[in-house]
């Protein structure tokens, strides 16, 4: 009996360091190892990095110019938030919680575009974890207080505005009253209207202009459509629930606990100001479609990716509930490679055939990618890579990890 108990204790002591090693977390800086020290084939990893560098996007680094060549050509496409020129193609590779490779300008703060959406959904997740949102299947309208647009000039009662609403009603139409938090999080709401001067139909409009204003609405939850106006609706709805600026919530409850730097900023639009409890507050955006969104370094992006790799846990603290992260990773029935914004899934290995089906990615225009691979214990941040080269890069990266040095 004593021998058996002793054997059990010895096994426990042996496995404890292994468990701790499997759950390594960075302090103020990432622990660093060479690829060889981390058990990664150095030459194959170099091949992957060289492939990424050779696959830099051809778009101009002047992102304001790039905007007016792309999204800026849409109806009402003017940029109304800040835009910043981008840097070099940059990457950071984290394996088993240790930084094994970096290149480019990983400290540089750049626009991360729609990776912002993953941070936005996380702030909604914090509201869910805290009981402020009881269920994602609840009707969003039931959580809304009146929203006053901030205007420093007293114009709301002028005669030329007689009959115009003084308040923003996000969910006032019969269709919008049926929208749940889940619909907004999965981009299946078909929300109708305009917010911050951007009509829902003006984002990636169809080639049928006659239908832009007249098409019948799809029942909420029945059609998936990627749409930044509707994501910005979610951001304003979340602000209305939190009653405080979302960047403050993110900083206090996620970025500080995971040790992010103080260099990131989350911007909204010039006109996206409302009054919350007597104070003007900017409602942030879910991306850089019309400017704004999250401006952040690759190092800090890697920390967020690592948080989601560990299912919301950081050290001994559960920053985001595991339940929330698992919900975010649940495929949207209408769009199986998509979970909550902006979790792109590898369901049936359709998105990236070279990666495991359990891998997922936080994606943004550019391409900004935060690749998360639980099977290989990997996080890879790559910025400004051609989207068509992503699977080729992942194929080479995974080969480097799989084939020991």
Please annotate each region the language model reported.
Residues 262, 272-288, 326-379:
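Active-site Gly/Thr loop motif
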Residues 118, 122, 187, 230-237, ...:
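Active-site-proximal alpha-helical segments within enzyme catalytic domains
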């Amino acid at each position: 009996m004593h021998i058996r108990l002793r054997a059990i204790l010895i096994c426990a002591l042996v496995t404890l360091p292994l468990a701790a090693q499997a759950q390594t977390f960075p302090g103020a800086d990432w622990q660093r190892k060479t690829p060889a020290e981390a058990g990664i084939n150095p030459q194959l990893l170099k091949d992957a990095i060289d492939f990424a560098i050779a696959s830099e996007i051809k778009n101009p680094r002047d992102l304001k110019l790039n905007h007016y060549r792309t999204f800026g050509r849409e109806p009402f496409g003017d940029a109304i938030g800040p835009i910043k020129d981008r840097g070099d193609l940059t990457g950071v590779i984290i394996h088993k919680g240790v930084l094994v490779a970096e290149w480019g300008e990983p400290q540089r703060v750049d626009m991360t575009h729609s990776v912002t959406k993953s941070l936005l959904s996380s702030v909604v997740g914090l509201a869910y974890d805290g009981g402020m949102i009881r269920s994602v299947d609840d009707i969003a309208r039931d959580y809304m207080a009146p929203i006053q647009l901030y205007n420093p000039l007293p114009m709301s009662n002028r005669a030329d505005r007689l009959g115009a609403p003084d308040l923003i009603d996000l969910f006032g139409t019969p269709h919008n009253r049926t929208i749940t938090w889940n619909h907004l999080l999965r981009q299946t709401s078909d929300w109708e209207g305009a917010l911050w001067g951007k009509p829902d139909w003006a984002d990636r409009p169809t080639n049928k202009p006659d239908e832009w204003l007249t098409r019948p609405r799809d029942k909420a939850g029945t059609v998936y459509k990627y749409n930044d106006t509707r994501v910005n609706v979610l951001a304003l709805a979340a602000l209305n629930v939190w009653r405080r600026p979302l960047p403050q919530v993110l900083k206090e409850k996620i970025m500080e606990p995971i040790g992010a730097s103080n260099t990131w900023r989350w911007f909204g639009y010039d006109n996206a100001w409302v009054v919350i409890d007597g104070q003007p507050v900017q409602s942030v955006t879910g991306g850089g479609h019309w400017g704004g969104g999250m401006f952040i370094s690759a190092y800090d992006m890697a920390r967020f990716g690592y948080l989601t790799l560990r299912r919301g846990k950081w050290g001994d603290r559960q920053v985001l509930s595991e339940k929330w992260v698992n919900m975010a990773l649940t495929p949207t029935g209408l769009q199986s490679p998509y979970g909550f914004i902006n979790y792109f899934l590898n369901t049936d290995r359709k998105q990236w055939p070279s990666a495991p089906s359990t891998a997922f990615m936080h994606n943004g225009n550019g391409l900004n990618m935060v690749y998360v691979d639980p099977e290989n214990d990997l996080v890879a941040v790559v910025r400004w890579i051609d989207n068509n080269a992503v699977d080729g890069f992942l194929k080479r990266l995974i080969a480097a990890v799989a084939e020991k040095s």
